């Protein structure tokens, strides 16, 4: 019997973000500044997946994401699973929930908004509309696509 082969090396302790839609791994690395922890980060792109066809995966050695950070990931990869690893074993498996509100992560794309350039904490209300994630700014009350806000 053939031993299963891992496409991406296992980690002893840290976080694995699995079942990221193929092509979104790099966006998550950038948006969540996962390279700034100073720890080893392993990324797999377009790996085979039984449920998705192909997927991306991110492994961060020595870093455990809290529930708030994990739920922020739902904006970019709602079907992703965040696994906490200890001694090479999954000790916690979290399925993501889209948060109702997100603060201090994105800047409002509206250049006339207080949330764009003023020293205030950005705040958006998160809604699903026709299968799309939409964010409504607390200050200017304009609604934007997730990608518009992420690029601002």
Swiss-Prot record:
Gene3D superfamilies, from UniProt?
Aspartate carbamoyltransferase regulatory subunit, C-terminal domain (2.30.30.20), Aspartate carbamoyltransferase regulatory subunit, N-terminal domain (3.30.70.140)
Q: Name one GO molecular function term.
A: metal ion binding
What does the entry's cofactor note say about binding and number?
Answer: Binds 1 zinc ion per subunit.
> Does the UniProt entry include the keyword Endoplasmic reticulum?
no
GO BP term (any one): 'de novo' pyrimidine nucleobase biosynthetic process
Annotated Zn(2+) binding sites: 108, 113, 137, 140
Q: Which GO terms describe its cellular component?
A: aspartate carbamoyltransferase complex
Alphabetical list of InterPro entries matching this protein = Asp_carbamoyltransf_reg_N, Asp_carbamoylTrfase_reg, Asp_carbamoyltrfase_reg_C, Asp_carbatrfase_reg_C_sf, Asp_carbatrfase_reg_N_sf
Keyword Transport set for record: no
Q: Which UniProt keywords apply?
A: Metal-binding, Pyrimidine biosynthesis, Zinc
Q: Which cofactor does it need?
A: Zn(2+)
Task: Tell me which stretches of the chain form a coiled coil.
Answer: none
SUPFAM superfamilies from the UniProt entry: Aspartate carbamoyltransferase, Regulatory-chain, C-terminal domain (SSF57825), Aspartate carbamoyltransferase, Regulatory-chain, N-terminal domain (SSF54893)
| NCBIfam families hit by this protein | ATCase_reg (TIGR00240)
The job of this chain, per UniProt, is described as:
Involved in allosteric regulation of aspartate carbamoyltransferase.
The family note in this entry says: Belongs to the PyrI family.
Q: How does it assemble?
A: Contains catalytic and regulatory chains.
State the name under which the record lists this protein. Aspartate carbamoyltransferase regulatory chain
Upper lineage is: Bacteria, Pseudomonadati, Pseudomonadota, Betaproteobacteria, Neisseriales
